[in-house]
């Protein structure tokens, strides 16, 4: 996935300015930065939920506007930060929604097979008949990831999926995402507010500030005290623990 000079403004206010970057395939890339930096807006543009004002966004060498909706939904999926659900659905029913780009609502045997594989992969089979409104926050988020995985796309975009999860649930979620990359070859782009989670689990980091790319590189390149202090405008020092850099806030 490649972005070239992406601009976005809303009511004459610049939200994104000249965003250019290339997402490495089969890696977990974290978007970090202060609130209002444009991370979630860019994720929406990358999934074509929000229109860009100008610039070029291409997936596998094709401009995103040239993909029809069904084609795009078989290549890329996004899980937004806020998901509204009102229907009384079981875990299995919600996961089955991921097959819509293929089944158009008429599930075939191969769709059910993919659903079963996904439930098993994420250890949700024992919960498949539970109603989603009876699940804990961590269980529910795992079910949403299962729905995304059932869609079977190469690109997975996640907007702050750790929100409302405790530390144990957050670690479990990040471990799952790392497995999707290492075992299934997925390309994952995730918006994170916890820099230390990015340090522990991301392969690459793109930092945003004031609607622009502030810096980008491997996790080791970005986890530098001076860069992060400038990014967040607070004093940050780093500690090296078991080969991983951890932020300490002054």
Regions found by a protein language model. Name each.
Residues 32-34:
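The feature captures the beta-strand-to-loop junction immediately N-terminal to the Walker
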Residues 96, 109-127, 152, 157:
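Conserved ABC ATPase "signature" region
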